[in-house]
Amino acid sequence: MGDGKGADALDKFWKRVKKYGAKIEYVATDLSAAFISAVKKNAPQAKLVFDHFHVKKQIGDAVDKVRRSVYHDKLYEEKKDVIKGARWLLLKNSEDIKTESAKKQLEEALRVNEPLAKAYYLKEEITLVWAQPDKNAAREFLYGWISRAIRSENRHIIKAGKGMFKHREGILAWYDHKITTAMVEGINNKIKVMKREAYGFTDDRYFKLRLLALHDAGITPFL
């Protein structure tokens, strides 16, 4: 266990890796530059596999920036309420939008704003990168997506497209080794629940003992 969220929180881990001569082949990670740099420094032989949830989130963040920019654009002054109310619908996966009223609300937001519609459909398309029959097909699809993003004429989506190009090999590495950060994210969520239920910990040592016992039978996240 390490303290903090930065790459230095893994210093003890990397020391143990070197001490025991562990040979790391693949590392699932988010798109944090600090963590990517730490892996390259301490395990240069390891292949980076960028977690698809975090890749999708980066595109979702770009879509939200588009939404905010058009919301403040005087050209869409009369449609502000439609755009503002559609925020969470724009960020959701389309298959998770169940009600007819929500679907109509999303359709209206996309209908009245072309830049937002382009950004939204690119966000939906990126998920197909991980649904291809093989790595070559995925590469072809990803390159096509990047090309469309860069031609979108929207600075937020262009930036996202360039980011996907920069990280393309780590995104496609999922086809070589299908690992994600899902388990780690699950553990992090349990820790958040534990801290919330306990209203914060003042004793760091006791908190770490609770973390070590988190997966023992009969141990719940709360005290």
Predicted regions and their residues:
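Glycine-rich phosphate-binding "P-loop"
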Residues: 1-8
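Acidic/histidine-rich catalytic cores and adjacent linkers
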Residues: 11-45, 53-57, 76-223
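General small-molecule cofactor/ligand-binding pocket signal
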Residues: 49
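Short alpha-helix plus adjacent loop in nuclease-associated cores
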Residues: 55-76
